[in-house]
Amino acid sequence: MSRRNPARNQERILKAATAEFARYGLGGARVDRIAARAGANKRMLYYYYGNKEDLFLAVLEASYARIRRAELGLHLEDLDPAQGVRRLVEFTWDYYLKHPEFLTLLNSENLHRARHLKRSRDIAAMHSPLIALLRDLLLRGERAGRFRKGVDPVQLYISIAALGYF
């Protein structure tokens, strides 16, 4: 691992940590295995991330960032409201199937009652653009008489995510 390319080093560490945490959970994950898989030493992991819990948070944030980027790439704002909601449901289902590590990371974090995500400065900001798009779809659908009035976009997204998750 090159010391002269911090971004690349962090990317390798996050990739290795994602695999480790997805397989073993936070409690079973070992920094030694993450370092070996990343081609780094433990000191480098601690230098970039401080401790295992902060590395886990970084993995969660990176995982959420990936799904949010993919969701925003759907361009739901360009679709008919019903098509947009349907597209988001289909995408969410497909994403979970293609990225089972995302669900196992969520399982691990759920066991800790979202302790790590609550400390994140970035997670809420990641959700906002998607919720705004979903709110717009719902309002457009409501005005067109296709959706009932008063659907909460946050609750709808939680329902969509839960359908794919469970």
Task: Give residue spans per PLM region.
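Short helix-capping/turn signature of helix-turn-helix
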Residues: Y49, S108-A114
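Helix-turn-helix
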Residues: R12, E20-D54, A58
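Phosphate/oxyanion-binding loops and surfaces in catalytic or ligand/nucleic-acid-binding neighborhoods
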Residues: A62, R66, Y95-H99, R113, ...
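Hydrophobic/aromatic residues within well-ordered alpha-helical segments
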Residues: K52, V59, S63, I67, ...
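Hydrophobic alpha-helical bundle segments that form small-molecule/ligand-binding pockets
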Residues: L117, H127-Y157, L163
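Generic hydrophobic, amphipathic alpha-helix propensity
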Residues: N9-A17, I34, V59-S63, I67, ...
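Hydrophobic alpha-helical connector segments
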Residues: L72-T104, A125-H127, L133, P153-I160
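Short coil/turn segments at alpha/beta junctions that flank glycine-rich nucleotide-binding fingerprints
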Residues: R23-G27, D78, H99, A144
